[in-house]
């Protein structure tokens, strides 16, 4: 029965499918917001109205893309679908909690959208800094609704993280050690630990903001002995691990895709890859104040956060060069998924290089809150996380659906998207270096040319998104079924057929120990 299967589901595959569909839908909303932003900035002068509505759109774009697109698809969608299959578990450790994790997201999304409907909306940027987010600058219920939305999304992610950690540690076959797990499983494990440790800090920060707004506390109000910089510390102690949460599952997926389409039986430097992910996870927690170089920290504090941030480049470099070494000498198959993975490696590396630039506190003082920062994090998110999602989706689509995509269309779509995102975000480096600030709906005429180019790129990306929807429709309409996958011996998620049965294992999987 429909309601029993989809509303009360305790099946990891069905919940994963729900996450993928929800993430795709939210992705459309987030894309619409981004198109509105670029339409406003396409030429000087005003298009939508004042800066408040513009900033509401910018804030919503960030929240929707982060909490309702990337995290549900990567962790909820791919994680739920693949983790049990990859470790030979019958399902997740807590199947009903898994269902609740998903169903907390639509109400959360509803609250976020509602926040833009009351008063003037939440025009604070996704960081929600007080005093702008306080009850003077943002009177009314907007920010409160946004805070409740974040609370629900946070609870969802924390429960999900507990579920994944328990599943991965506890539900492997006895003969399978930590170091027999596929890299995607490792990436989700590290991601879940990061979520579990960082989200409670965000919850504390936004709850204090909520009481500051409604109960007359003064956590962030200097008049009552509070400090707005405390909020920044709490927010970024969550916010920096969060950006690694968004990219780590992508690392895992890219490792699988690169290995598969290079015809290799394993990625180069498995242990190095695992330790690199754990190092990135650890270091991600001790660099948060590099987002706050401009609030007036001591020179020695700035020196520490600069050098600690640069250290993250080392494990990241280990991963990039291990991917290249995996490619080396392989029988490379130029499938669309491989193209996405190679695009990921190239563009993520560019984003990493601009990250190294911004790690220097002296440079960041000048570049902070300019479009250089926007360009940097969109290179690692819009071309890192999104490219990984696209590659993973195309690679595992036959597993999820039992049908194959049209590879010609998929390659065309990759090309269109590649041109679109680069035309959108590469010029923003120049805008930032010329001093164009973020979060403004208008700009001096001197910035017109690069902004126009950037906005053209966003419309090309929109065409690519529409092409992807068409490709999925075409696959389900044509019903080209999968007969056999290659390299199944080293890619265990494919072993039970495409798609796998509703209940993968009627009895525990037997894994022979090599030791």
UniProtKB/Swiss-Prot annotation:
CDD domains: Cyt_c_Oxidase_I. Pathway: Energy metabolism; oxidative phosphorylation. Its EC number is 7.1.1.9. Residues 1-11, 87-94, 171-182, 262-269, 328-335, 401-406, 479-515 are mitochondrial matrix. One of its GO terms (molecular function) is cytochrome-c oxidase activity. There is a cross-link at residues 240-244 (1'-histidyl-3'-tyrosine (His-Tyr)). Mg(2+) binds at residues 368-369. This is Cytochrome c oxidase subunit 1. The lineage of its organism: Eukaryota, Metazoa, Chordata, Craniata, Vertebrata. The gene is MT-CO1.
């Amino acid at each position: 029965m429909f309601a029993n299967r989809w509303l009360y589901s305790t099946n990891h595959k069905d919940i994963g499918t729900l996450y993928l569909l929800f993430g795709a839908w939210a992705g459309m909303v987030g894309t619409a917001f981004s198109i509105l932003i670029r339409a406003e900035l396409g030429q000087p002068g005003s298009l939508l109205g004042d800066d408040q509505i513009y900033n509401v759109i910018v804030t919503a774009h960030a929240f929707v893309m982060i909490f309702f697109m990337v995290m549900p698809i990567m962790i909820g969608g791919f994680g739920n679908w693949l983790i049990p299959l990859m470790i030979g578990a019958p399902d997740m450790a807590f199947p009903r909690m898994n269902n609740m994790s998903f169903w907390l997201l639509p109400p959360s999304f509803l609250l976020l959208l509602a926040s833009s409907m009351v008063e003037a909306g939440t025009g604070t940027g996704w960081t929600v800094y007080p005093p702008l987010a306080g009850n003077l600058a943002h009177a009314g219920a907007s920010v409160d609704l946004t805070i409740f939305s974040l609370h629900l999304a946070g609870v969802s992610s924390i429960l999900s993280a507990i579920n994944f950690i328990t599943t991965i540690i506890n539900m492997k076959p006895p003969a399978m050690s930590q170091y027999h797990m596929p890299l995607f499983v490792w990436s989700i494990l590290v991601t879940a630990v990061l979520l579990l440790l960082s989200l409670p800090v965000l919850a504390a920060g936004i709850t204090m903001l909520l009481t500051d707004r409604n109960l007359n506390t003064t956590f962030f109000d200097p008049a009552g002995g509070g400090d707005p910089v405390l909020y920044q510390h709490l927010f970024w102690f969550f916010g920096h691990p969060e950006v690694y949460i968004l990219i780590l599952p992508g690392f895992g997926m890219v490792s699988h895709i690169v290995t598969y389409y290079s015809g290799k039986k394993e990625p180069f430097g498995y242990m190095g890859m695992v330790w690199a992910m754990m190092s990135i996870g650890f270091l991600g927690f001790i660099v948060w104040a590099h987002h706050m170089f401009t609030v007036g920290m001591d020179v020695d504090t700035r020196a520490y956060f600069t050098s600690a941030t640069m250290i993250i480049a080392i494990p990241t470099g280990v991963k990039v060069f291990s991917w290249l070494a995996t490619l080396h000498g392989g029988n490379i198959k130029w499938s669309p998924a491989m193209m996405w993975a190679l695009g990921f490696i190239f563009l993520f590396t560019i984003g990493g290089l601009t990250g190294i630039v911004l790690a220097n506190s002296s440079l960041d003082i000048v570049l902070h809150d300019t479009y250089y920062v926007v360009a940097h994090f969109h290179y690692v998110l819009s071309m890192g996380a999104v490219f990984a999602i696209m590659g993973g989706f195309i690679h595992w689509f036959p597993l999820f659906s039992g049908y194959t995509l049209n590879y010609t269309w998929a390659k065309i779509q990759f090309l269109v998207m590649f041109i679109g995102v680069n035309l959108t975000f590469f010029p923003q480096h120049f805008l930032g270096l010329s001093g164009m600030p973020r979060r403004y709906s208008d700009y001096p005429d001197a910035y017109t040319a690069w902004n126009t180019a950037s906005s053209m790129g966003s419309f090309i990306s929109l065409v690519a998104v529409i092409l992807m929807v068409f490709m999925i429709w075409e696959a389900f309409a044509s019903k080209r079924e999968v007969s056999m996958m290659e390299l199944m011996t080293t890619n265990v998620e494919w072993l039970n057929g495409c798609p796998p049965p509703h209940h993968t294992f009627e009895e525990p999987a037997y894994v022979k120990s090599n030791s």
